[in-house]
């Protein structure tokens, strides 16, 4: 699979598993000095290659990337890649169960995954 095809497949897999809802979340992968990232408002379960844009790995998080339609979470993806040079991809999802648990536990609470 190509990198973009991988992102399309992962988006569908997340949706099929019920881990994302409609427009909740975004995906990216590092490709050398480029990040391939889903567009703002892309539906992860229905991604097409046109929903993935290429932006520089490093750069200003302002106008050029916004005009390309990159996810508004691009600065977060860049920060993760900068902090973890070995990271090849970022999956940002909002599983309903995790969101519900965080609301039930309250701010600052922690829990152990099972």
Where are these regions (language model features)?
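Glycine-rich flexible loops
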Residues: 1-114
